[in-house]
Every structure is written in C-alpha cells, then in structure tokens.
Amino acid sequence: MKKKYIRRVLYLLIIVALFGLYFFPITNDNKSTNHIFNTTTSKNLSTKTKIDVKSEIEKYNNPDIIGYIYIPDVLSSPILKSTTNEYYLSHDNYGNYDKKGSITMDYRVNIGDKKILLYGHSGKEEDLPFLVLNNYTDESFFKKNNIIYVYDSNNTKYTYKIFSSYIETKDFDYVNIKTFNGLSWKEHLNKLKNKSLFKTDTELTDDSKVIILQTCSMVNKGNKKYQLVIGVLTNIE
C-alpha cells in the first residue's frame, strides 16, 4: 500500500514537471508580445529635438555619419551610410567592427528622397540599435510615439508621421525605390498602409515621401520576419 502511494506521488510530480516544461516556453514567448523591449537602447538618449549632425561627425570622427534619427523618448542615434547596406550592420558609429552594428541608410538613397530606408539589428541583447521598433506592434505605443525626426548633415529637420507598422514575412517590395510591381507610387504607399496592424487616417498622394525603418521581428520569433515602421513626410525646416 505504501509503495502504491509513493508511486502515485511520483506520478503526480512527473505530470506537474511535464506541465511546467510545456507551458514555460509559451509564457516566455508571450512576454515578447507584451512589448517589454527597452526604449532607451541609444546611449545618452536626447530629450531635445534640435540635433547638430556635424558635432556627431566630429564626436565619432566618422564622415560616414550622414544624419541623425530621433524619436522622442524612444530612439536617438546617428545614421551611417556606406557603399553597401551590410557594412554598418557589423560596424559601430566609429567605424569599428561590432556585431551589434549601427543604424544604416540604404546605399541607394539619400535623406530627403521619395523613399528612404534605414536598417538596424534587434535581438536578445537590449542595446541593439533597432530593438525598440518591436514595440510598434502595441497599439498604444504606436499612437503615442508616432513622430520621427531625421536630420541631414546641414541640420535640416525632416518630420515624419508614422502611418504603418507591421511584420513582413514574404513580400519585400517595400525595399524597391523605382518600380513597384506594376503599382503606381500612390498605390504602393497605400499597400504599405493597408498592411498596418493599426489604422490611421493618413492620406497618401503621388507626392508623398516616406521613411521605412526595418529590423528583425522579435515578436513570435521566426526566420525572415521583419518589423517595419513607416512614416510620411509632413514638414521640412
């Protein structure tokens, strides 16, 4: 009788252990959808909207710094550009090798173009350049932090209002800068808008200019999944 009782206790303990192993990873994964990603990944996060890009170039002694991106309370960082998109994904703001990389602009475009694309890493480490973009899968975060400022080397400020945020898995037309699979420019932009997790009343036209921020998605982890945050130009000063 005693042996039978012990066997039952052991049996229950095994079930509890298996139950815990089964549900722990699910709970852990769900944390990634609760938007706990660090919103201060950039060192010395600025709280002002006036940036001196030339001083940033001097600070890092790197002429590849061509601008600055600032999202209040979210992101503050130089923008770098090389002859390839890959270089600054494995080099820091000084130009030294660093697997964390920097925020890099697509080599095909310039600040002020009809479409500018910025790339940066995200991952398990909290200080990766674009980890914070994964927070834009949360509607309240999306609505609260919807303005992007970009400064060029002359300190001209470009203001963008975010109108789309979504995770892309297979349609990578958004990186095209000249042709859009038969769509007009306006149709292309509305396609990006309609993919958004959250709806906005942003009106897009043939004259609209946009910025696209891309990083690897940390929500429901998987291969070839990119978090995109897209804004339309509203002001230049």
Residue ranges and their predicted role:
Residues M1-I15:
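N-terminal Sec-pathway targeting helices
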Residues L12-F24:
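N-terminal type II signal-anchor transmembrane helix
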Residues L21-E237:
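Solvent-exposed, non-transmembrane regions of membrane-associated and secreted proteins
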